Amino acid sequence: LKVMASRRIVLLGKTGAGKSSVANTILGEEYFTVSHFSPSGTKQCQEKTKCVDGRSITLIETPGFFGTESSEDQMKAAVISCITQCAPGPHVFLILLKVERFTKQEEELIRDICQHFSEEALQYSSVVFTHGDQLPEVEEIGDFVCKNVALNNLVMKCRGRCHVVDNKYWKRGEEGNYRSNQFQVAEILKTIDQIFEANNGGCYTNEMLQNVHREIQKEEIMIMSSSVSLSQEEIRGRAEVKVSDRLLILFAGIGAGMLTGAFLGVLDLLTADSEHNYVGNCQVLTKLFTRYY
């Protein structure tokens, strides 16, 4: 079986949207920790790579960047983890929303995502609705979307791409049945392929993610020269940890909310090659962050 090129998929959504469960549903196994009790859900990025129907999929579940109750230090570590794991950028964003009334809170969530990511990111996005059991029997998700102007506008900006799953009631649906996760996951995978191909295999990126990617590549070369027995996955993992540690030092005086803005493309990361540059770059970043926030 020929394996297609790897796709990096980032799951976005507020706390309680069901990101961990959707990730497990797509991969077909319980890889991601589902938090039913923590008010903030996932505290750190969770990442898993698996071959799904001939395609290598790397799912990166983000913590609730929007509306999280995590501490400043937890949030900062989580954002930096996402930066290093995503670099040089995700091929697809899955924006998760519940099948429920589209309130001002949801509108604000979408407004924040669009504001931080830019309109271009929506070319790499699809909306995935959770709690599909709330969808009336006679409706498909497109019917639900059309009932709300703001929601319909969002889906249209994502070029009409939307799907629905149910992490509780649709687990054992028959093949070909619209109201089954098996059917919906197959459709989601098709959409991921379409986005990947429409962008010629390119990913959403910005200067910050590109700089982080270059730093990871440098670390990989150094690790390979001293540890020839490690697998490529182990080398990448160690390189990410080293770069992540450097970023934690670099952003020691930067607030997590501001750092989130940098990750989402509001600002560019300046490459730090020395201890002197760490200090200088931190001062520059502080000025830039102050300008935007």
Where do the PLM segments sit?
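Amphipathic alpha-helical interface segments within eukaryotic helical scaffold
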Residues: 67, 74, 85, 95-101, ...
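Conserved beta-strand segments of the P-loop GTPase G domain that flank and frequently precede/overlap
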Residues: 95-98, 127-131, 164-166
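C-terminal non-catalytic interaction/localization modules
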Residues: 1-51, 57-59, 68-74, 105-123, ...
